[in-house]
């Protein structure tokens, strides 16, 4: 399964460049709330429920994996498939990443509690996709959520 099958153009947001993204300062909790809203809309789950599961996981250990990337994730009993959202913060933000650097790309995933193996494969796919610095830089420079989504589609097509 491709990551772009878990996303939609409506769940990719570039902060400060998309009209839906607030230009004010962004805290870690604010970012989780934005991602939860995007995921909740797609999955048909209340935003607060998604935000709580992402925040609970984040409280265990930061999902900031380094190189400007964070992958907030969690599981919900009432889901029957995985959903993903991408928040791009071009100026970077503090996220308590393991390498101590700012995070620019926040790729969130929620899925069913019973699908642990599938969930782990998705997290690994995201990590592999974002390993390439040139590709990360392209995403960070994207002018809109649609442009970023199109980059993801092209990158996954090239890797097939």
Q: Which residues does each PLM region occupy?
A:
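Cytosolic covalent-transfer regions centered on His/Cys nucleophiles
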Residues: 1-160
């Amino acid at each position: 399964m491709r990551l772009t099958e878990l996303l939609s153009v409506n769940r990719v947001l570039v902060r400060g460049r998309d009209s839906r993204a607030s230009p004010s300062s962004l805290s870690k909790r604010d970012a989780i709330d934005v991602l939860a809203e995007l995921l909740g809309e797609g999955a048909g789950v209340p935003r607060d429920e998604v935000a709580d599961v992402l925040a609970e996981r984040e409280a265990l250990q930061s999902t900031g994996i380094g190189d400007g990337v964070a992958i907030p994730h969690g599981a919900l009993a009432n889901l029957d498939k995985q959903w993903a959202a991408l928040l791009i913060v071009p100026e970077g933000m503090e996220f308590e990443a393991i390498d101590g650097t700012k995070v620019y790309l926040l790729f969130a995933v929620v899925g069913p509690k019973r699908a642990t193996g599938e969930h782990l494969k998705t997290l690994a796919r995201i990590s592999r996709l974002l390993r390439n610095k040139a590709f990360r830089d392209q995403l960070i420079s994207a002018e809109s959520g649609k442009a970023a989504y199109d980059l993801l589609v092209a990158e996954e097509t090239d890797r097939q």
